[in-house]
């Protein structure tokens, strides 16, 4: 494989992994432990 192909596959899989991880953090079981600063300061 050419270097550009390997590099583009690596970068796209890295971005996909970061996206999947951030969705898991936002909506997964860990999301119950996240604090909401807007709810803390509502009046």
Swiss-Prot record:
Indicate the transmembrane segments per the record: 5-25
Is Acetylation one of the keywords UniProt gives this record?
A: no
An example GO biological process term is: photosynthesis
Q: Which UniProt keywords apply?
A: Chloroplast, Membrane, Plastid, Thylakoid, Transmembrane, Transmembrane helix
Q: Where in the cell is it found?
A: Plastid, Chloroplast thylakoid membrane
Q: Which InterPro entries match?
A: PSII_PsbN
Q: What is its main location?
A: plastid
Query: Which domain of life does the protein's organism represent?
Result: Eukaryota
**UniProt membrane topology term:** Single-pass membrane protein
- Please provide, in alphabetical order, the Gene Ontology terms of the cellular component aspect for this entry: chloroplast thylakoid membrane
Pfam families for this protein: PsbN
Family named by the database record: Belongs to the PsbN family.
Q: What's this protein's function? A: May play a role in photosystem I and II biogenesis.
Q: Which PANTHER family match?
A: PROTEIN PSBN
What is the protein's given name?
Protein PsbN
- Organismal lineage: Eukaryota, Rhodophyta, Florideophyceae, Rhodymeniophycidae, Gracilariales
